[in-house]
Amino acid sequence: MATIRNLKIKTSTCKRIVKELHSYEKEVEREAAKTADMKDKGADPYDLKQQENVLGESRMMIPDCHKRLESALADLKSTLAELEETDEKEGPEIEDAKKTVADVEKQFPTEDA
């Protein structure tokens, strides 16, 4: 049985993952610039290799965040649908959840959307 509390949790989860994804994207940009700068300045090969590893790890997190976001979004949609079936169609939590779903789908279009 879906509850408003579960809906709030799933909404917050989606928001947190979106924030995390943006953070990783910024980190990749920052680390890529740092790596390019190190290459231009002729940095020590060991340091350059370590920096490339850092950049690679940051890049690996983006697809992981996308998968988690798709899963969290699916959970949120199903919880929202369950609540609407039980005639709870209004309220600040439901509006927030609908807004979050719309925002996530607009920013990150999925294959099924």
From Swiss-Prot:
> What is any one GO biological process for this UniProt entry?
post-chaperonin tubulin folding pathway
Impact upon substituting residue 59 to A: No effect on beta-tubulin binding
Mutating residue 24 to F: effect? Slight decrease of beta-tubulin binding
The family database entries (SUPFAM superfamilies) matched by this protein are listed as: Tubulin chaperone cofactor A
Q: In which tissues is it expressed?
A: Expressed in leaves, roots, flowers and stems.
Q: Which GO terms describe its cellular component?
A: cytosol; peroxisome
**Effect ascribed to mutating residue 29 to A:** Decreased beta-tubulin binding
Q: Reported effect of changing residue 57 to A?
A: Loss of beta-tubulin binding
Q: Where is the composition biased (Basic and acidic residues)?
A: 89-113
Provide the phenotype resulting from gene inactivation.
Embryo lethality. Embryos consisting of variably enlarged cells with cell-wall stubs. Abnormal microtubule organization. Endosperm indistinguishable from wild-type endosperm in regard to nuclear multiplication and subsequent cellularization. Cells undergoing cytokinesis divide abnormally although they display pheragmoplast microtubules and accumulate KNOLLE in the forming cell plate.
Q: Return the Gene3D superfamilies for the record.
A: 1.20.58.90
- In this chain, the stretch annotated as Disordered covers 83-113
Q: What is the effect of changing residue 49 to A?
A: Decreased beta-tubulin binding
User: Which keywords does the record carry?
Assistant: Chaperone
Mutation effect (residue 50 to A): Decreased beta-tubulin binding
Impact reported for residue 22 to A: Decreased beta-tubulin binding
InterPro entries tied to this protein: TBCA (IPR004226), TBCA_sf (IPR036126)
List GO molecular-function terms, semicolon-separated: beta-tubulin binding
Subunit record text: Monomer. Supercomplex made of cofactors A to E. Cofactors A and D function by capturing and stabilizing tubulin in a quasi-native conformation. Cofactor E binds to the cofactor D-tubulin complex; interaction with cofactor C then causes the release of tubulin polypeptides that are committed to the native state. Interacts with TUBB9.
Give the family, as the similarity comment puts it: Belongs to the TBCA family.
Name the job this protein performs.
Tubulin-folding protein involved in the control of the alpha-/beta-tubulin monomer balance. Functions as a reservoir of bound and non-toxic beta-tubulin. Required in the developing embryo.
Can you say what this protein is called? Tubulin-folding cofactor A
